[in-house]
């Protein structure tokens, strides 16, 4: 959902088409057996990867608010149409510092939206919580709309802790995290989680290894 919305540009106000056009003679029969249980779903989620940073930073306030409404609202209009999909979980990407590296990150320029900055500014443990402003905008909107659960996920450790100094492995199925920095990476995740908890976010999950060998 987020990816589809963010693929459009900011030259016009996005207006969703709520009413599905069906032939008048169409009949749809749906049978729901509430007694049959298949699984337990903890939440309905999406994430801010990848373009939400640019949308949150550079798009107009009206369009950003419209996107947030589509993602998080559970209200219905006077015709019974949902104002949004009512996400109950939001996944926030804890970047590793590839954005600060630019082309040196090894993430090619035509995929530069996949470069993500890092709250940790150096290996000595200093943090800059003003980073990822665009993605934090949507995280805040999720909270305002009543999103119950937030997941922090990481595609890479901070680049200070990796073998090749990048936010991607260049050796295929190979861990890029130096063994001597396992504890440092855990501290990074815990520090970020505590920060957002202190900011009023209900951090329910931490996913430290997300898509570890995706070739980007």
Segments the model singles out, each with a brief description of its role:
Residues 4-26:
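Bacterial Sec-dependent N-terminal signal peptides
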Residues 25-34:
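Boundary/junction segments of secreted and surface-exposed precursor proteins
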Residues 16, 23, 157-158, 208, ...:
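Proline-rich intrinsically disordered, low-complexity coils
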Residues 199-216:
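Internal metal/ion-chelating core segments
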Residues 12-13, 119, 213:
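Intrinsically disordered, low-complexity regions of eukaryotic proteins
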Residues 33-203:
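N-terminal catalytic cores of secreted or lumenal carbohydrate-active enzymes
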């Amino acid at each position: 959902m987020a990816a589809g919305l963010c693929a459009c540009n900011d030259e016009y106000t996005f207006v969703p088409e709520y009413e599905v056009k069906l032939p008048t003679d169409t009949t749809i029969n749906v049978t729901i057996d509430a007694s049959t249980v298949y699984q337990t779903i903890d939440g309905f989620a999406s994430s801010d990867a990848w373009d939400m940073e640019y949308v949150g930073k550079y798009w107009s306030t009206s369009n950003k608010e419209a996107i947030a409404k589509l993602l998080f609202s559970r209200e219905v209009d006077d015709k019974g149409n949902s104002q949004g999909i009512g996400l109950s979980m939001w996944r926030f990407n804890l970047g590793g510092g590839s954005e600060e590296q630019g082309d040196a990150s090894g993430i090619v320029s035509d995929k530069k939206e996949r470069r993500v900055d890092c709250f940790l500014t150096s290996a000595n443990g200093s943090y800059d919580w003003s980073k990822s402003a665009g993605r934090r905008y949507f995280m805040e909107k999720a909270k305002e709309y009543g999103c119950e659960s937030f997941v922090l996920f990481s595609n890479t450790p901070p680049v200070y802790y990796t073998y090749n100094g990048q936010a991607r492995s260049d050796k295929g199925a190979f861990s890029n995290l130096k063994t001597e920095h396992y504890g440092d990476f855990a501290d990074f995740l815990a520090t970020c989680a505590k920060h957002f908890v202190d900011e009023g976010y209900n951090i329910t999950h931490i996913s430290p290894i997300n898509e570890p060998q995706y070739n980007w």
